[in-house]
Structures are given as C-alpha cells and as structure tokens.
Amino acid sequence: MSRGKLEDMEQKETSEVDWIICFALIQSRNPTLWKRALSRKKGDVEDVGALKSEKNLKINPRENSKHIYKWVAPFENGFLNNKSLFAHLEPIYNFLCQNKYKSFEDAVGLKELQSFSKDVSTADINNWFLPRYKILLKILSLKTKEIDFRGLSQVFQTLQILLVSHYSHRIDSDSSFKRTLIDVHVFNFIAKFLFNRILLKKNQNDPKWLQNFYDQGDGKHLCDKVDYKRLCSLHFTLIYSIINIQLIKIKTNQTFEPQILKYVSVLKLIEHILIIIESLIHVLIRFVSKHKLICINRKKAYCRVYLERELSLKKTYLKNFYSVISGVPEKELGGLLKILKIVILSLLETFESIEWQHLKPFLEKFPAHEISLQKKRKYIQAALLITAERNLIARFRLSRWFNETENI
C-alpha cells in the first residue's frame, strides 16, 4: 500500500474519532439537542418542511384581533361601547404580537409608529383612550390574585403605544405640547392620580361597569390595595419611551445642524422632569423635618448647595404639591410619605432608561448643556443628602445618566 493511501486512511480514522467524541459530548452535555438531532435524522424530509413552515410562519391579524376583544370582555360596556375607536388598537395589538421578543424601540419604525395614531384626534385621546389607560394602569397595579393580568397587560401596552405615537407626533408640530405632556403625565399623575384618587380615594367616580368589576361579590373590593412601585414603573415607561423616540428621530436624520433645536427641545422635556423630582424631594424634606430634626450645617458642601438652590428653584410645582397634600389627614401621612419616596425613586430610575448615547454627540459639541444637566443633578443630590434617606441616596449615587458623574 502506498504511503499516500496510508495517510488518507489515518486522516479518515482521526476524523471519525473526532466526530465520535463530538457526538458523545453533545449527548452527555445537551440531551435535548441530541434527541432533536436523532428525531430529525429519522425524518429529514418532514422536519425540513416543518422548519421552513415555522420560519415563514405568518401571524394572522384576524386571530390577534379576536384575542384583544377577548381580553376586554370583562369590561365590554366600557371598551366596546365605541367600536370605531377601539378598532384603532387592533393594528397596534398585531404589531405587539409579531414583535413580542423585541424591545419596543428596536421593533417599531418611525413611519409605522406615526401611523398608529394618524386618524386619532386629541379629543379622542383625552376623552376616551386616556381614561381607559388609567383604569388598566390601576388594575394592573392591584395586589390581588383574583385577576389574570396577562391579557389585560397586552391591552395596556397597546394603549400605551398609541399614546407614545400620539405624543411623539404632537411634540414635533406643537412646541407647547412638551409642557402639556409633563403637566398631564408627570405632575398630574403624581398630584391628582396618585395622591388624590389612589391614596385619598377622592374624585373616583368610577363608571358602573368598572365598579361591578371591582366588586367581587364576597365583600372584597379589589381596588383597596395598590402596588405603587409597579404603578409608577408601568406609567413612567410612557415618559422615557417618548423621549427615546424623539432621540431616535434626531439620530435618523443625518444632517446635524438642523437638529440642534430638536436636541434642545428634548433637553427641555428632561429639565421639566428634573424640576418635578427636585420639588418632590423638597416636599419630602418638609415632611421628614416634622418628625425628626434636620440639621443643616453650612460648613458642608451639600448643605450650601441646597440652601443656594432653595432660593432659585422655581416654585410652581412645589406650591402645587404643597397645595394638594396640605389637606391630607394625619392618618394618611405615613402612606403619603411612602408614596413620595417610591415616586422619587421611580423617576430617578426613569432617567436610567433614557438612551443617553443619542444625546452624547450634541452634549460634546455644546458643553454648556451638559454643564446645565450636571448642575441640576448636583441640586438633586444635595437635596437627597438633606433628607438622609439612605435608600434614595444610594440609588442616586449608583445611577448614571448622560456621563460619569462626580458625587458631592
């Protein structure tokens, strides 16, 4: 036998040994994959066909639409009383079903997002969609095992995407809309929805179809216990999603200079929220000072920063918060204090969800805006240090927004 043939045989044997070792490793370390490989080997033609059909599987929009109607069945009188408006949710629900393994920002195209609210008026948003959004927000935040949240959660996400679409489009066409957005979905959400409606149970006026849902018939009333952390987390997703969509819009336009005003517009939106956070911390300081002595030592840097800022902080939100909570009964003060801390924490976490990398080129080119953000962050940190609330201080120190930030 020639030397060349011997070498070929040795290589073949070595190759076979390598494959045997490889298969043995798969069999021992991943039995599921091994069984799948065996079953595929037994029926190659059938399995290839199955794989192709699985890969090219098209989701039937009609089937999805049936599901969304099924999920709102317990609220038929409230959600299906206007089927022409409810129909606007169907394409959004189909979009969610087709992209359930992707993040919202990665899945949606800007034109597609705009199309979701194209034929929906602001009046329809305010009078029909928004009240139902708040109802589902409250229901999804209930501490109960009586409700299957899965379907309702999808309907809530559908409504939230509609709101993101509407507000993202309106901010571009109406410069005053930024303030409206923050006043309605941050300030009013905290002052009127959380403090008044949820904590103090004022102005509830729930429609009959909702009261029937809450009343379980065994003496239980489902709306008695709310998970405030979940409530804030669900709702503030709306805020950072709108900000992120605005940043993605700017990023997709390659011409930098015309986008300067849009960058500034997003920063103003962010600054409004920062003022609300600061105002809430000042409210917290007033509450804490009623129960324990707060010592402000002017020798400490953070105390000097706090006192300086106390004079210059815009009082609009601060006065409104004080006005709302001044009527809170003594027995509810403990609950109010708890909610205050949760809201502050949730808003700080919201800032971590903003896609700051999209703002980075602008902040580098115009450092004055970054300095302004750094200053506002310093004001918030100083106020938190005055409260001596360890959880809030620790969470804030660990947070990173637009840049690596030095602590006071």
Curated annotation (Swiss-Prot):
InterPro entries: MEI4. It is found in: Nucleus; Chromosome. Its main location: nucleus. Transmembrane segments: none annotated. GO terms for biological process: DNA recombination; meiotic DNA double-strand break formation; sporulation resulting in formation of a cellular spore. One of its GO terms (cellular component) is condensed nuclear chromosome. Signal peptide: none annotated. Keywords: Chromosome, DNA recombination, Meiosis, Nucleus, Sporulation. Belongs to the MEI4L family. Interacts with MER2 and REC114. Component of the MER2-MEI4-REC114 complex. Required for meiotic induction of recombination, viable spore production and chromosome synapsis. Component of the MER2-MEI4-REC114 complex which seems to be required for meiotic double-strand break (DSB) formation. This is Meiosis-specific protein MEI4. The gene is MEI4.
